[in-house]
Amino acid sequence: MMKDELMSDKKIGVAVIGSGSIATHRHAPEYAANPNVEIVAFVDRYPARAEKLAAKYGAKAFSDYKDVLALDSVDAVSVCVPNAFHAPIAIAALNAGKHTLCEKPMATSNEEAKEMIAASEKSGKFLMVGHNQRLASLHVKAKELLEAGTIGKIVSFRTSFSHPGPETWSIEGPTGWFFDKKQAFVGTMGDLGVHKADLLRWLLGEEIVEVASFVEHLEKPMGDVDDNAVCILKTSSGAIGTLTASWTHYPGEDNATYLYGTKGHIRLGADPRFSVLCFLKSGEKQYYEVGALQTNEGGGQSDTGVIRAFVNSILTNTAPEISGEEGRRALAIILACLKSSESKKFEKVEL
C-alpha cells in the first residue's frame, strides 16, 4: 500500500468543492487526518452544507467555487459535485493552477475527459480521478498474484457492485441529484459500474475493447437514470467476462470479483473472513486475510487511500497512478456500455 506521507514545512492548502456525502465521509476526514494538509475551504451551492463542514474543520465556507480558485492559499482541490459538473469545475481549477482530484465518473463524455487531461498538461498541475478500488488491500494482493502468474493466463472474469441505492446514504436522500439525469448523467453505472471498469483494467493489465450491455431503469420511482446494468466485456487478449451494477440489492451489498485463469481462479470479496481466495488446478488452496472492502452499510471506508495518494503525488512531484487518462479509459468503457444498451449491438470502446 501507499507509504506514509513525506513531511513538508509548508502544508498543502486544500479546498473541497461540493459538501455532500462523499465530501463529508471521505474527502474531509481523510484530508483532516493527513499531517501535510490544511483544509482551507469548503464550497457548496447550499451554503449551510459548506458552513457545517467549515465549522467542523476550521475552514472557510463559500457558495461559489470561482471565489475559492482565486485564493493563493489553495494549492489543490477535490471536485465532489454532481457528475455533470465535474469537467467544467475541474478544468477551471486546473486553469487556475490547482492540482485537482476529481470524483468519478470524471466526465460525461470522452471529449470532456480529454479537455480535462489537456488542461492538466497545459497547467502542469496534476489531475487524479478518485477510483479507490484498485487501492483496496484485497485487490492489491490479487494484483500481486496475477503478476506472479499464480493462476496463469486470465480467460474469463466476473465482477459485481450493488447496494440498495444512494437514497440510503446520500445526504439528499431519495430526492438527490443521483436520480436526476441532467445532473448525474448516469445512475448505477456512474456510481458503481465505473469503479469496476477501472478495477478490471488495472487487475488484468489490459484494455476492455468491446462490450454488449443492458443498462436499464427498472425499479427506482424517483429518478430517470439507470438502476441496473448487466454488461459483457471482451479484453484485448480475448478474455471475456461480465460486469453488473445494481441499486436494487436489498439489503446489504455485493462487491465481489472472480478471475478465472488457465491454472486456477481467484475470488475477491466473496468470503467474510478471507477476502482473497485462490484455488489452483493442482488442488492447492490459498487463503489470504488481508482486509475486506468496507461497505456503506458498515459506515464506509475510513481511509480509501485516495487522498493519501493524491497528497503524496503533490509532495513528491510525481504524477498520480490514477491519472486523468486512467479515469478516461474507465469512463470510455461505461460510455460504450451505454451506447450498446441503446443500439442493441456490440460496441467498441474508444481507447
What feature does the model see in each segment?
Residues M2-Y57:
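N-terminal Rossmann-like dinucleotide-binding module
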Residues G58-Y65:
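Conserved SAM-binding strand-loop segment of SAM-dependent methyltransferases
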Residues Q133-G223, K344:
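Predominantly a Rossmann-like dinucleotide-binding segment in NAD(P)-dependent oxidoreductases
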Residues M1-S8, A76-S78, A309-L351:
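C-terminal helix-rich "cap/oligomerization" subdomain common to oxidoreductases
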Residues I22, Q294-R308:
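Active-site loop of classical SDR/Rossmann-like NAD(P)-dependent oxidoreductases
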Residues S8, L71, A76, P82-R134, ...:
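Beta-strand-loop-alpha-helix segment that lines the small-molecule cofactor/substrate pocket
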Residues D191, A197-F274, T304-N317:
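Contiguous beta-strand/loop segments that form the cofactor/metal-binding neighborhood of enzyme cores
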